[in-house]
Structure formats: structure tokens, C-alpha cells
């Protein structure tokens, strides 16, 4: 058996040690300038929530541009939550992959999630809660690494793994513009519209070149930002989609207990041991 040697990192290297990685400004990946530009273009922001608020950088942008907005920070642990008390009006520690958001139905004007969704499996539940919490006309602004960035396309062409989606990393979901919109279309159809799509960071170029390149070619950028607007009442489409599509993964669907109605295993199924409740039930196993 041939032994495969350890692959050396390329572009997105460990600790930024690769010479090409040193050229880039890692702060560009979070696109604070993109967040500011998109938030500046919104009006009537009364309730704003940030999922995975981290250091509170993006909430600080909202506070500066919309000083009267009520800011809600949601974090998974107490490490960041303590510091967020100075940045947000309310701070909650919650598991966004399992818990309901601390928002009433149709309460939020804007929900943000920057460099968060790629860390999650339960994407259907998260979007279910976001769309439940947004008012009609409210916006969801999220930034995610782009699996179709220019440097990732090059890496894939030579048989290397995309830097943002390695098995030995914290990222569990890849995103691209086309696939993200296909996901939204499948789950809510005409219930949303994409109002803005932007790029940030352009590997392996320094910031002075990265920004204009990301602006001109966002689908090739390292990070992609979506600003979507909720255009209709939400009917639970995200939570029920895994069952309707018969996805054979035990996705969490909260208290949406109607999921199993969509599952009708064929009578001649060769796998008589299939437990549809285990696959689709709303309760954890």
C-alpha cells in the first residue's frame, strides 16, 4: 500500500505561515467594510440580533450607524458573552443549532451572522428560526467562506482540498453563491429576495488589491456576503424541508412535529429496520 505523505498547506496555511498567506490582511475575511456599507443602506432598524456576535465588532457598526436600535447578541459560550455586555443591550448564551432564538415571531428588523454558518450542521433549523424571527421586510445579513473562491478553484484543479472546508477544521458546511440561492429557493421559494451580494478578501492579494478585486468579482472572493429580505409570511419551510426532500440525516427540527408526515417508506423497502422517527423526529436521540 502506498503511503500518502502529509500534505503541505497552500494559501490558507496553518498559522498564516505560507509566504502567500503573509501577503493578505486576515481582517479582510470578515469584511467589516462590507458589513458597514450594507448596514448603512438599511433604514428603520429597531431590533437587531447578531448570531455568534464574537467580539461585537459588527454590533458596534450597527450601534454607530443606528444608535437607537435595540441590539441583541447571541453567543454559544460565556467567553465572548461577558465582553458583549458592553456592546449589546441584551446578551444571550444559546446553541443556535438547537435553541429557539430569543426573539418573538416577526420581531427583528435585521439578523446578522458573520463567519458562523460554516461551523454548523443544523442549517435548516437556523434559517427556520431566522425567518420566524424576522418581520416581513426584515433582512438577514450573513457572511461565509466561499468554496468557489479563485484560490479554491485552483486548489481543486490540482487535487487539493479547499482551504475553508478541510476535514481537520471547524468548518462543516461549504457555501457558494449558486448553491446558497438554490437552498433558499428550495425551502422558501418566493418568500425572500436577494437584495445585495458582495465579496471580501481575495486570496492571495494584499488589501489594496483585494478590495477592488472582490468588488469586481465577488463570486471569486474568499468571503461572500448575502443580504436577503423576507418578503412574505413564513410557513416553516426550512424546518420541514429535510423531511419533504427525504434527506436521510437526522436534522433537528425543533417543535415542528409534522415532519414525519412527509416520510412514507416504500412497502417493498429492503431495509425493514428503518426507524423513520430516528431519521426525522423532532426530538434528539
Task: Give the location of each predicted region.
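Short glycine-dipeptide loop
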Residues: 134-139
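Conserved class I S-adenosyl-L-methionine
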Residues: 141-163
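Conserved N-terminal segment of class I S-adenosyl-L-methionine
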Residues: 1-104, 110-112, 124-127, 142, ...
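Acceptor-substrate binding/catalytic loop of class I
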Residues: 163-179
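Conserved catalytic loop of SAM-dependent methyltransferase domains
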Residues: 181, 186-223
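Short, hinge-like loop/turn segments at secondary-structure boundaries
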Residues: 89-92, 157-161, 214
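Short catalytic micro-motifs in class I SAM-dependent methyltransferases
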Residues: 114-119
Amino acid at each position: 500500500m502506498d503511503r500518502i505523505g502529509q500534505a503541505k498547506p497552500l494559501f490558507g496555511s496553518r498559522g498564516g505561515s505560507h509566504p502567500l498567506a503573509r501577503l493578505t490582511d486576515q481582517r479582510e475575511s470578515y469584511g467589516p467594510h462590507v458589513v458597514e456599507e450594507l448596514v448603512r443602506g438599511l433604514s428603520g432598524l429597531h431590533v437587531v440580533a447578531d448570531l455568534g456576535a464574537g467580539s461585537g465588532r459588527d454590533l458596534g457598526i450597527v450601534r454607530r450607524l443606528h444608535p437607537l436600535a435595540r441590539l441583541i447578541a447571541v453567543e454559544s459560550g460565556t467567553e465572548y458573552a461577558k465582553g458583549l455586555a458592553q456592546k449589546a443591550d441584551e446578551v444571550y448564551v444559546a446553541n443556535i443549532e438547537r435553541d429557539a432564538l430569543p426573539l418573538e415571531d416577526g420581531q427583528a428588523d435585521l439578523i446578522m451572522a458573520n463567519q458562523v454558518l460554516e461551523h454548523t450542521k443544523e442549517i435548516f433549523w437556523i434559517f427556520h428560526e431566522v425567518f420566524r424571527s424576522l418581520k416581513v421586510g426584515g433582512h438577514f445579513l450573513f457572511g461565509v467562506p466561499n468554496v468557489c473562491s479563485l484560490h479554491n478553484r485552483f486548489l481543486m484543479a490540482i487535487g487539493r482540498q479547499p482551504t475553508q472546508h478541510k476535514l481537520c477544521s471547524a468548518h462543516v458546511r461549504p457555501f457558494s453563491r449558486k448553491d446558497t440561492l438554490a437552498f433558499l429557493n428550495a425551502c422558501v421559494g418566493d418568500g425572500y429576495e436577494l437584495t445585495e451580494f458582495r465579496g471580501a478578501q481575495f486570496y492571495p492579494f494584499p488589501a489594496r488589491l483585494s478590495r477592488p478585486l472582490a468588488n469586481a468579482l465577488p463570486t471569486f472572493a474568499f468571503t461572500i456576503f448575502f443580504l436577503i429580505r423576507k418578503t412574505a409570511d413564513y410557513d416553516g419551510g426550512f424546518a420541514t424541508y429535510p423531511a419533504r426532500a427525504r434527506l436521510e440525516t437526522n436534522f433537528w427540527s425543533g417543535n415542528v412535529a409534522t415532519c414525519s408526515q412527509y416520510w412514507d417508506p416504500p412497502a417493498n423497502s429492503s431495509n425493514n429496520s428503518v426507524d423513520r422517527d430516528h431519521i426525522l423526529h423532532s426530538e434528539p436521540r
